[in-house]
């Protein structure tokens, strides 16, 4: 496939953002909704029928103030005006949901908004922590097909996610910490640049609670990377890839770690692995890396 044809295909592929899931009425905030949001984001990250589009890339535009994000995650804010949001961000699909946990089981009510068709599709799913969150995935994939976005690359979205309830809750707390850092940014700080560092306590606790969790290792890698700890971030991403060799987030993290130390060969290796995982053009990945090494004009 030529680059021009690939660009044309990219234009045709829609974008989908997974919003943080909210606890059902009566269930206190525990971080699990954000952990589940991260899980579904990683499932859809390898969907080759969609353009790559992460909530974290848009979090500051969706929730420009930290209190807006924290209120939404705790169920104190309604879902934003979906038509206006979709038009402004040029994102067609938005997945939202509520959850409740009963022992080992997590019950989800999901809604997929299609801003182009001005429609909303719903599904109820149950996931089990004891089976690597595998039960319910095929039902979710089948539902996406009925919504007009059949999953391309299902085999890459079937890793066993070995995370405990505590690990999932700590994961969500860590993710909220990361998102709040994205929203606040260094420009909004009134003190030294050192305060831009993320407190990694929740990230570490998630890994300690669920050492064999791809999601926990991957998120810890991003926290370390954001703090400038490239060597430790790379180690965390490598641990994540041992658990899920096609984890799109960890592949991206390894690429950015390589770029950070001017390792062109390493950056190209992981950029092309990531592109291959998503069914994207390998030469486009090469061009992306080449541009990072071009001398400024």
Describe the role of every protein-language-model region.
Residues 9-83, 94-103, 115:
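Short beta-strand->alpha-helix linker/helix-N-cap micro-motif
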Residues 209, 243, 276-277:
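Structural marker of alpha-solenoid helical repeat scaffolds
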Residues 213, 247, 281-282:
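Residue-level recognition of tetratricopeptide repeat
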Residues 75-145:
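Amphipathic beta-strand/beta-sheet edge segments enriched in Tyr/Trp
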Residues 1-11, 116-212, 216, 223:
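C-terminal/domain-edge helix-coil "capping" segments
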């Amino acid at each position: 496939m030529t680059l021009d044809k690939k660009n044309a295909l990219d234009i045709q592929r829609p974008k989908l953002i997974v919003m943080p899931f909210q606890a059902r009425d009566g269930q206190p905030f525990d971080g699990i909704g954000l952990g589940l949001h991260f899980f579904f984001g990683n499932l859809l990250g390898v969907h080759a029928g969609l353009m790559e589009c992460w909530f974290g890339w848009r979090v500051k535009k969706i929730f420009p103030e930290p209190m807006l994000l924290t209120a939404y995650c705790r169920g104190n804010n309604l879902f934003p005006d979906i038509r206006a949001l979709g038009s402004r961000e040029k994102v067609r699909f938005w997945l939202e949901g509520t959850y409740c946990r009963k022992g080992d089981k997590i019950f989800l009510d999901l809604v997929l908004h299609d801003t182009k068709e001005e429609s909303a599709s719903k599904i109820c799913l149950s996931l089990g922590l004891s089976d690597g969150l595998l039960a319910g995935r095929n039902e979710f994939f089948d539902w996406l097909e009925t919504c007009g976005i059949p999953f391309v690359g299902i085999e890459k979205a079937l890793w066993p996610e070995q995370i405990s309830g505590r690990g999932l809750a700590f994961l969500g707390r860590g993710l909220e910490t990361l998102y709040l850092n994205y929203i606040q940014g260094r420009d909004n700080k009134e003190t030294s640049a050192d305060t831009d560092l993320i407190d990694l306590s929740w990230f570490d606790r998630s890994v300690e609670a669920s050492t064999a969790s791809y999601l926990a290792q991957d998120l810890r890698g991003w926290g370390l990377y954001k703090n400038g700890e490239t060597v430790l971030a790379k180690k965390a991403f490598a641990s994540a890839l041992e658990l899920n060799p096609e984890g799109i987030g960890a592949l991206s993290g390894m690429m950015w770690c390589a770029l950070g130390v001017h390792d062109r060969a390493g950056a190209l290796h992981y950029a092309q692995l990531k592109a291959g995982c998503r069914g994207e053009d390998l030469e486009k990945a090469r061009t992306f890396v080449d541009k990072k090494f071009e001398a400024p004009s």
